[in-house]
Amino acid sequence: MYAHIARARFQPEHSDDVIQVARDSIDAYRELAGFVRVTHLYDRASGWGFALSTWQTEADAKAAVMPLASVTDRFAPYWAEHPSSEPGFFDVIGALPTFEVVAES
């Protein structure tokens, strides 16, 4: 399995909106080939959010990036700072590589 990690900082006063977008995005992930799971993590106080998506193959993980760009766009109104990564990714520091999942419980 392989995983993508995305992180972004949102406006804390829009926490409820950010959480709703995350919840609404689940179906978009489920429609994609090789999808295993997605976990959205969020800290209401700081506005930091993380998404960890897991995919069957590295090719599946990489192929999911552009189809999920619409999910990224739905988060945009709530960013505290505009992500500085390549299209299809959202990350305030830079796009992270696709990781191989080497242990899980």
Language model features: what each stretch is:
Residues 1-49, 56-70, 77-105:
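Short S/T/G/P-rich N-terminal loop/turn motif that feeds into the first structured element of a domain
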